[in-house]
Amino acid sequence: SGYGPHAWRIMFFIGVLPALFALWLRTGVPESQKWEQSNEKRKSARERKKSGAAMSEEDHALTRFTFADLFADPEIRKRTIIVFLMSLTTTLAWWGISTWVPPFIAAAAGKAGLPPQTWASYAGMSYNLGAICGYIGLGFLADRFGRKPIVMIFFAASLLLTFALYRWTTDLHMLLVVAALNGFFTLGQYSWMSVWLPELCPTRMRATGMAFTFNAPRFIAFMGPLFAGMLIAQFGGFSGMAVAFSFIYILGFSVVPLLPETKGKPLPG
């Protein structure tokens, strides 16, 4: 790099600029009407609790700590556990598959007498270009065909395309194409969380439910880098490890049917 040892700092500085732009955008985005109504109910319930007045079941729900509320109601508890398993599938499998795309293709390029670092860059760009398309595409597809079938297709396709990338494709240029397709499904599938999760949680706990579902699996996935060397040796290299992790998609695929289809339905109150 022409920027020397400070190149990584420049990269992170550039990466934070969109976050600052989003922070500015946030100042012009109003709170939703449903949240405003729910917040007013919460304030009233807290006032009744402080004054010792009689409280309804809804009042008790509104004054509970929202994280505990996720597990208080049987139906919400069921949904929380299911979406946690789906999020764990997405996060853990994505780490175990995507991390090794650049070194895997770089190794293939090296065997063909081509510069490995250059092809590792091509691999990363191809994978992430596909992922961007997947981020955008999942939302349109879910609105057209429904949340359940599209999420199940993304899980199933991720499993198959991991085999296609790491086991079935040998041509170097085709590896870049398959890497893009793999990125479309394995990383692009993260969009299901922003599409489906808001439609599964009541307003009073929606943000808490989304934050828990999105972030809790990371407390498991973060251990991956700590054991990466051991896992690569255990599974016989990059490809063996990636294929082994792809079977996690069976878990996500299996639990999706247990959730309600929410396409075209209003957000819970």
List each language-model region with its residue ranges:
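Interfacial helix-cap and linker-helix signal at transmembrane-aqueous boundaries
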Residues: 1-3, 105-106, 141-142, 228-236
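Central mid-sequence intracellular linker of multi-pass
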Residues: 2-71, 250-269
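Helix-loop junctions at membrane interfaces in 12-TM secondary transporters
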Residues: 2-5, 167-178
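Extracytoplasmic gate region of multi-pass secondary transporters
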Residues: 74-133
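A late C-terminal transmembrane helix in Major Facilitator Superfamily
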Residues: 129, 203-235
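Cytoplasmic membrane-interface "Motif A"-like loop-to-helix N-cap segments
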Residues: 144-155
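C-terminal ends and interior cores of transmembrane alpha-helices
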Residues: 156-170
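Intracellular juxtamembrane helix-capping segments at the cytosolic ends
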Residues: 188-201
